[in-house]
């Protein structure tokens, strides 16, 4: 069997889209599963839209997710260069061979002339090119040249139906009349994507083309071009195709770059970790088993086969992504989670980098099983680094927990904590349990709700006693007294 060679070949425009990254993941996983190679090349021939910033973003995305490649940009390989903008001479050479072999021909017809011929024949004028220039005589060509016309170059499409066995969709067929001769080079001689993409695949000996469903209609043209490239000695084989299902967004519409959920880096900013993102993207068209949604990247690679990918559209579900991410956060060793959380808070929030390491380790331990994203870690811990006078109580939580009935547990809690000699979690818990649960006979939810809101500003926080230890005696008592003074709580007008 020929060694598998797959490619990921994005254009450097905008920010990485989750659908694009899903394509990269499936190519990477297939290469790793089969022991093949992933080639990462850049299709940067659109000078008006391409940017070095977007190129850097693609590298960042691949590196963040751990999707390494065997040949391509930045790492090199036997088929350098791996950016289309640097391969113009190669494309011109192949185009010349196609012209010399009669595989492509000059077409001088304007769009208006094509439409007029359709009208004259009683056909829909928007049918597209009619292959008229295939049979131009030398005299006709000379006349067009004398007019100053510059031809585009079109590939002669064989007049046949097109069938192939798609790795995802099974047998696919396009009728011959749907595939007119297509342009491979502009009138200025510049080769188009329709030529350079298959040429790169041919020269880089790509065996499997795994790409989005939106490119399915172009497959007959590409197969025809591969056959022409084989006849002129440029290609050795026609690759096998597999077209991955659309990723759908809200309202069952295809997820577009305008949808916030499509932005990979926004998910990173929101605290999705690579393991969670890879797991979730893997489920967009594939599954490990009917009853297992959580898997490691190693399990994914070991079990992934492109033949198991489903053809039906996959819907992007933010809540499911976050639930899967939560599982992967919990699976991290405590020390690694602490490092990830610290790095996230440092890059994306105002959490102070000089917060004591021992206290941060304790705090990280408290939130690891309570968050779905790293960003939620900030939400749970920010009260620890907020000045007492700057703490703002969540209005809904304060209205619910700082009613008239909260005065008694607040007073008792303050008195009990003032008497604690050594400020530790066990001592704090013992003092509050004795004062509020045993002596006042309150249920824990009633007893501690007001205290939690008072010290954290929120109804949800890390465990109360541990939070008080982290906050310290002075800040804890200052906040409790401030909340007591504001009880019963009245929302600001």
UniProtKB/Swiss-Prot annotation:
* CDD domains given in the database record: GluRS_core (cd00808)
S-S pairs? none
Residue ranges of the motif 'KMSKS' region: 254-258
Q: Where in the cell is it found?
A: Cytoplasm
Q: Partners and quaternary state? A: Monomer.
Say which species the protein is native to.
Corynebacterium efficiens (strain DSM 44549 / YS-314 / AJ 12310 / JCM 11189 / NBRC 100395)
Protein name as annotated? Glutamate--tRNA ligase
Write down any Gene Ontology CC term.
Answer: cytosol
């Amino acid at each position: 069997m020929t060694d598998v060679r797959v490619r990921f070949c994005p254009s450097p425009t905008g920010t990485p889209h989750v659908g694009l990254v899903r394509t990269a993941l499936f190519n990477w996983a297939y290469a790793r599963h089969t022991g093949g190679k992933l080639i990462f090349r850049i299709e940067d021939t659109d000078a008006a839209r391409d940017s070095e910033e977007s190129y850097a973003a693609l590298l960042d995305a691949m590196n963040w997710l751990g999707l390494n490649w065997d040949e391509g940009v930045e790492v090199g390989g036997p088929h350098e260069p791996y950016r289309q903008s640097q391969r113009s001479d190669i494309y011109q050479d192949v185009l010349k061979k196609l012209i010399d072999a009669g595989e492509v021909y000059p077409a001088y017809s304007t769009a208006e002339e094509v439409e007029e011929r359709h009208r004259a024949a009683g056909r829909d004028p928007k049918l597209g090119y009619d292959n008229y220039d295939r049979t131009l005589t030398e005299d006709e060509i000379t006349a067009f040249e004398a007019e100053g016309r510059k031809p585009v170059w079109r590939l002669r499409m064989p007049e046949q139906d097109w069938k192939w066995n798609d790795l995802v969709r099974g047998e696919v067929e396009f009728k011959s009349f749907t595939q007119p001769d297509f342009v491979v080079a502009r009138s200025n001689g510049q080769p188009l994507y329709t030529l350079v993409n298959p040429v790169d695949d041919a020269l880089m000996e790509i065996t499997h083309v795994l790409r989005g469903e939106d490119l399915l209609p172009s497959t007959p043209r590409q197969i025809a071009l591969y056959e022409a490239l084989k006849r002129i000695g440029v290609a050795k084989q026609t690759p096998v195709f597999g077209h991955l299902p659309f990723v759908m967004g809200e309202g069952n519409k295809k997820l577009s770059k305008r949808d916030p959920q499509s932005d990979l880096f926004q998910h990173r900013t929101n605290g999705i970790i690579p393991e969670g993102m890879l797991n979730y993207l893997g489920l967009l068209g594939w599954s490990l088993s009917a009853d297992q949604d959580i898997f490691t990247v190693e399990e994914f690679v070991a079990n992934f086969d492109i033949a198991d990918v489903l053809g039906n559209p996959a819907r992007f579900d933010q809540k499911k992504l976050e639930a899967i991410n939560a599982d992967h956060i919990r699976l991290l060793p405590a020390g690694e989670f602490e490092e990830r959380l610290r790095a996230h808070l440092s890059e994306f929030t105002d959490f102070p980098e000089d917060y004591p390491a021992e206290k941060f380790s304790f705090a990280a331990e408290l939130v690891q099983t309570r968050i779905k994203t790293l960003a939620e870690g900030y939400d749970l811990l920010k009260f620890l680094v907020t000045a007492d006078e700057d703490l703002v109580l969540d209005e809904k939580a304060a209205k619910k927990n700082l009613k008239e009935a909260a005065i008694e547990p607040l007073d008792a809690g303050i008195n009990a904590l003032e008497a604690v000699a050594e400020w530790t979690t066990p001592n704090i818990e013992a003092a509050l349990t004795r004062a509020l649960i045993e002596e006042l006979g309150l249920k824990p939810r009633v007893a501690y709700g007001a205290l939690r809101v008072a010290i954290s500003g929120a109804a949800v926080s890390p465990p109360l006693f541990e939070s008080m230890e982290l906050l310290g005696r002075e800040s804890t008592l200052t906040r409790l007294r401030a909340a007591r003074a504001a009880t019963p709580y009245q929302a600001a007008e």
